[in-house]
Amino acid sequence: MAMAGLYRRLLPSPPAVDFASSQGKQLFLEAVQNGTMESFYRLVSYFQTQSEPAFCGLASLSMVLNALAIDPGRKWKGPWRWFDESMLDCCEPLDKIKARGISFGKLVCLAHCAGAKVEAFHASHSSIDHFRKYVMKCSTSDDCHVISSYHREALKQTGTGHFSPIGGYHAGKDMALILDVARFKYPPHWIPLTHLWEGMNYVDESTGKTRGFMLISRPHREPGMLYTLSCKHESWNSIAKFLIDDIPFLLTSEDVKDICKVLSVIVTSLPSNFEEFIKWVAEIRRGEDGSPSLSVEEKARLSVKEEILKQVQRTGLFKHVASFLSHSCSGHTPTSGDRDTFPVIAASVCCQGAEILGGKISSSAEYCCRETCMKCWKAEDDKPIRMVCGTVVNGNTEQGVDVLIPSSCGKLSCTCSSTTKSIRKHPASTDVLTVLLLSLPTSTWAGIADEKLLSEIHDLVSIENLPALLQEEVLHLRRQLHILKRCQEGKVDEDLGVPLS
């Protein structure tokens, strides 16, 4: 019985020149001599094949992020933190990308959320000279890379829209080296820049916008260490809208006279599942037999997370939030049920950890955490370390998962009573809500009529008043929120040049 299938495609030449051909090798040698292949070496070290037919954008981005040595802040498999297509799910659910690919603007969104510095241009708002300038810039350096979004038809290739990184440039021939991530289809190849530019001028039917190119480089600061925004839950659209649009309106329409009233207006209106939108990032690894031990790197990361948690709990805003949320003060809580209790959090994180360590693009609902236990021990520097150890079951398989928990010890006195309450040791709703409020745009509070209260609010949320680590966390979340709101409005493909501050 016959079986249908394809084994690669013949590269149309011209216009392309196969990188491995004698002519392709000669172009490479000449470009190396002219200094326009500097980006090639790091990129080719992390060259990968897209794992799904529609994952060209994700493969291109993960390849570039790894080439730039940007730390994803979470593990891929085993002990390794590494960008993989399955981890790029901040701006669009993976199942949707798998079904229909990703737009240029949403790939830009993903690059921002992954912690990269991004400059992006639609072809309709650029020029071939502008494009050539940036290709030359990145080809003579190894600290920035270009990803091109183009239509294959302009290159006389089969297929439609495609993403791939540019691995170098030959100035004399005006040709770019395409490191095609669809390696099952076409090999790396040189292509005249004019043809590539033509391909970028095709309109993407899903957005009505032309394709384009983006420059990706390392940021001056690393992405969020402890907190991040997530669009995995289907409610993220409504939550982003609430945070950016509804809160300013509520503060304008309500007669707020003090901080407690401001918090009341916000907390009582919060969507019930807002905690699905902002998460604290747990460090996971495969379960170990015997006495647990931490690498120097794991200790350093845990120490930074704990310092950020302490800095959150030292802010004036945290004290107001904790006081408001305490039962004797308000009776309001932004969580529902027992989802904020430590056993529930531990079981949930273990299931997510097993999913990530298994490298599967699926739902952690398929995993069941059979048991968890807490291990506490002292490191060599006599510092206490807490780890949740869980056994997760998926079908007939079991996976041991260890979760490092950042902790912060302290006491908090409630301003409405004489009682003193212990602060929970793991990141909890009070911390998360505080960070979320700090991350709102500065314009959020502009509608407060009481000038004295407005001044007090500004002092509490001012980025300048925060310590350095927390300042970086808050700025990262502000960028994420701004980008996700643009995604929610469908504007991410329209205003690529809008600042993200």
From Swiss-Prot:
What Enzyme Commission number does this protein have? 2.3.2.15
**Tissue expression:** Expressed in roots, nodules and leaves.
- Residue stretches making up the Peptidase C83 domain: 1-221
Pfam families (UniProt xref) = Phytochelatin, Phytochelatin_C
Q: Where is the active site?
A: C56, H162, D180
Q: Which reaction does it catalyse?
A: [Glu(-Cys)](n)-Gly + glutathione + H(+) = [Glu(-Cys)](n+1)-Gly + glycine
Any idea which GO molecular function terms this record carries?
glutathione gamma-glutamylcysteinyltransferase activity; metal ion binding
Tell me the InterPro entries matching this sequence.
Answer: Papain-like_cys_pep_sf (IPR038765), PCS-like (IPR040409), PCS_N (IPR007719), PCS_N_sf (IPR038156), Phytochelatin_synthase_C (IPR015407)
Q: Where are the transmembrane segments?
A: none
Q: What else is known?
A: In roots, Cd(2+) and Zn(2+) induce preferentially homophytochelatin (hPC) synthesis whereas Cu(2+) has a major effect on phytochelatin (PC) synthesis.
Q: What is this protein called?
A: Glutathione gamma-glutamylcysteinyltransferase 1
Native organism: Lotus japonicus (Lotus corniculatus var. japonicus)
Query: Taxonomy-wise, where does this protein's organism fall, top ranks first?
Result: Eukaryota, Viridiplantae, Streptophyta, Embryophyta, Tracheophyta
Q: What would be the name of the gene that encodes this protein?
A: PCS1
